[in-house]
Design a protein with these regions (language model features):
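Alpha-solenoid repeat junctions
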Residues: 43, 277, 324, 340, ...
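Alpha-solenoid HEAT/ARM repeat scaffold
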Residues: 68, 81, 107, 120, ...
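Hydrophobic core/packing positions within alpha-helical solenoid repeats
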Residues: 74, 126, 162, 182, ...
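Amphipathic alpha-helical scaffolding segments comprising HEAT/armadillo-like alpha-solenoid repeats
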Residues: 107, 383-389, 412-433, 454-465, ...
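Conserved hydrophobic register position within alpha-solenoid helical repeats
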Residues: 158, 312, 349, 387, ...
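Residue-level signature of alpha-solenoid helical repeat scaffolds
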Residues: 204-207, 404, 447, 463, ...
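Alpha-helix N-cap/helix-start positions at coil->helix boundaries
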Residues: 396-397, 439, 455, 469-471, ...
């Protein structure tokens, strides 16, 4: 085997050496350019060799009058000055601004973006230059622009960014003014979007409110944003996301020292989990009780009135009662009996404590609540939508802008992906140089985009979908699943809302989305669609993901969906049961109240263990 690999390596080296010799022999001819391009398709070669080939091709393109293609190659090489000179001839303000930022000439980039009316990009470049005052001015200009064009969402985001800059400049009055404007715009736009049925759009508005609270260090907008996000998730039936947002809200509230909110949110999450049949209700209710005990302790330490301590302890009693924890209920009543309350109350609490201690002593040991899984505990990543959505609104959707911006991004983009981005951009330039229609790209270019494996390919694919006929739309959607990026669901969603070949392509693409990052979107689509083929495709892909979390969702579908969908979930669990699902299955077998389902889960557990033994 080692000898075979060595032979293949020598053959590949020999092939490349011959290809380089051939390209040099062809000289400054179209065939010569094609030969260098063929070499650039070897995206895994050594950086020094690849850079040499790029320089040869760039020089050749300049001689052929292909300035734009040459500029893209120099951008890949991070040759800022040559790229700028070439982009000045044929490029756009976005091209120039992007290269200036690569060269850390952020002040020049700010001016370029500003002259082009790209105020979001200009403000971001000013931030990178450390010029918070200029960034503040630009963000405020963007607020006025978006208000004038009646785009309250982007105006609200611009105001949020202006507040960030004002905070850096210690301009307290300006922070308060811009945050007040931001809150008004995002609240109103969130309401409007909800009434229009755009729950996802409203959700983004409420995420903005969460950030307002973080900047202002005020709990009110922070809580308003989270509670509205949770409410929308409940309306959409996204039980998994609802629990995740509850947990994240609780953790964030705890960090802010909002103990009463922490206790109440635990209780609310527990009641919700019990209502929808999640087995983690007892975990949240127990945590709620413990949080109320902490509130009671702190009230006592601060010397607050006995009535406040009493209220907290009674809230803990209520939560412990919900999980039938008589021992801890008795302990709470003992503490209540020791408070400085009326003799009548103290006697009653003492009697209750005695009675419950007697009952608890006779009772058999109770199982602890099901452990809350680690994947639910993960803190949700902070989505900087207040920056990203502003920049995205100004970005072009053509290939040179959407994919081309990765070419010179050596800090955030893998080297091979930078090379693939360069090749896609050069192929697009070939199409334009040959007189092709920018809105009608050849199918081969669609294939290249789909095989790019980067979220940046989604935006041009969406543009091609919008501009294409039915055949083009279907091709774009079918190939989009190859991206294996969760962002591709923007296309799949649109295809599923269509008809004919396009909708069929959407369902087919859905069946191909089997990677772990796709799980959240698959769950969302399953919950938001009624069509059997869509739910069937989503559920099949969820099962193929095969993680602990996917297993949890399949069990939830099995419990809560009557008829064919429950049968489908059961079949998929039997087909896909694997080691990664074991912890979820064991947890659910222990807590499952339905005997038949408990036996089914037990059989899956035993089968996985047998497979594990056979593998050893």
């Amino acid at each position: 085997l080692r000898k075979s690999r060595r032979t293949l390596h020598h053959a590949r080296v020999s092939y490349i050496a011959e290809a380089v010799q051939r390209a040099r022999h062809l000289g400054a001819t179209p065939d010569g350019a094609a030969a260098w391009r063929e070499l650039l398709a070897q995206t895994h070669v050594d950086e020094a060799d690849y850079s040499d080939w790029c320089r040869e091709l760039a020089a050749l393109y300049v001689r052929q009058g292909r300035q734009l293609a040459a500029a893209r190659i120099h951008e890949y090489l991070l040759n800022v000055d040559p790229a700028l000179e070439l982009y000045k001839a044929k490029g756009t303000a976005r091209d120039l601004g992007r290269v200036l930022r690569i060269g850390r000439r952020t002040r020049e980039a700010t001016l370029r973006y500003k002259d082009a009316g790209l105020f979001g990009h200009a403000a971001r470049a000013a931030e990178e230059a450390g010029d918070s005052q200029d960034a503040l001015t630009l963000y405020e200009q963007l607020v006025r622009q978006k208000e004038a064009t009646r785009d309250p969402y982007l105006a609200g985001l611009a105001a949020l960014n202006a507040a960030r800059m004002a905070q850096k400049l210690n301009q307290g009055d300006r922070v308060r003014t811009t945050l007040a404007l931001c809150m008004r715009l995002l609240e109103e736009e969130g309401d409007r979007r909800e009434q229009a049925g755009d729950k996802d759009g409203a959700f983004r508005c409420y995420l903005g409110l969460v950030q307002v609270g973080r900047i202002d260090k005020s709990y009110e907008p922070f809580a308003e944003g989270y509670l509205n996000c949770i409410r929308i998730l409940k309306q959409k039936g996204d039980r998994f996301f609802t629990i995740q947002y509850y947990y994240d809200f609780i953790a964030a509230s705890d960090e802010l020292g909002e103990l009463h909110s922490v206790a109440e949110l635990h209780r609310e999450a527990g009641e919700y989990a019990r209502r929808v049949g999640f087995i983690y209700a007892d975990y949240f209710l127990t945590e709620a009780a413990e949080a109320w005990l902490k509130v009671a302790r702190m009230a006592t330490e601060k010397g607050q009135s006995p009535e406040l301590v009493e209220n907290a302890l009674l809230a803990a009693v209520s939560c412990f009662n919900r999980v039938q924890d008589d021992k801890n209920v008795a302990h709470c009543y003992t503490q209540l009996a020791g408070l400085d309350l009326s003799d009548k109350k103290k006697a009653r609490y003492s009697d209750l404590a005695t009675d419950l201690e007697r009952l608890a002593a006779k009772a058999t040991g109770r199982d602890p609540p099901a452990a809350f899984p680690e994947y639910f505990r993960r803190r949700l990543p902070v989505q900087e939508i207040w920056v990203r959505d502003l920049l995205e609104a100004e970005n072009g959707s053509d290939i040179p802008d959407a994919v081309g911006r990765l070419i010179g991004d050596h800090k955030n983009v893998w080297e091979v992906q930078r090379r693939k981005a360069l090749l896609i951009s050069l192929t697009y330039d070939d199409h334009i140089a040959a007189g092709g229609d920018p809105e009608r790209v050849p199918p081969a270019l669609i294939e290249s985009l789909a095989g790019f494996q980067h979220a940046a390919a989604v935006r041009p694919l969406v543009a091609m979908y919008d501009q294409g006929d039915e055949a083009t739309k279907a091709l774009v959607v079918e190939r989009s699943a190859q991206l294996k990026q969760k962002e591709v669901f923007a296309l799949i969603d649109r295809a599923l809302s269509s008809s004919g070949r396009v909708r069929e392509a959407g369902v087919a693409a859905l069946r191909g989305m089997k990677s772990q990052p796709a799980l959240d979107s698959l769950v969302r689509i399953f919950n938001s669609h009624e069509a059997h083929d869509v739910r069937d495709a989503a559920l099949g892909s969820i099962a193929a993901v095969g993680t602990d979390e996917a297993c949890e969702f399949l069990l939830d579908v099995l419990r809560s969906n009557p008829g064919n969908m429950a049968i489908k979930a059961r079949t998929l669990l039997e087909q896909h049961a694997q080691e990664r699902m074991l912890s979820s299955l064991e947890r659910n077998r222990k807590q499952e109240p339905d005997q038949a389902l408990r036996l089914f889960i037990g059989r899956l557990v035993e089968r996985i263990r047998l497979q594990r033994g056979a593998a050893l």
